Amino acid sequence: NTFFKDETRPFAQKCFDGAYYRKAVSGKDKWLGIGGTVVLPQIEFDENRKNPNKPGQYLDNPSVYLGGNMGGQETDIGLTWEVVKESGVVSQERKAFRPFMRRTAHISGQEENYANAPAEERYYWYPGEEVAISIQIVDDYKLKFIVDGAGKRFETDYECAGYKKGNIGEFKRVNAIDQVANEGKPVQLT
């Protein structure tokens, strides 16, 4: 690993139950953002783990994302396996990776939020495609989120009341298989 001079090094953290994931977290320091390039995973679903409440979907859902924690506010921002719109109709099955943004509530009164990029072909990425993903503090309380690859680009600003230039925080990168309605519980075999 390469560290910057005077960088605060990360420490071991307990894993959150309810999903399979590989997470790398920075130390707590005065960061401005994080970015990386990834080849989106090939997916093979467990036919024994179909979602009984959503025909065509599974109880396991892959995602690749960045995020962090600053000012007591947690963020997850990246790509998740999601439904798409085909000929104006939302698919029952999840068929592509789509950008998503999630933040927890903040002491300032900002509410928690979950949002996706519009369900449009120009914002769909597929297994095996290479993408660059980044989040950066561009102004106090504002992150810029960019996904770029395979001839497509998504870019947006995302309000996050805990994120401010010069504040101490941490950033992360995560590859996950989230499990529907299983947060905080032991992971299910898949």
State the predicted function of each range.
Residues 1-190:
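Exposed, interaction-prone regions of secreted/extracellular proteins
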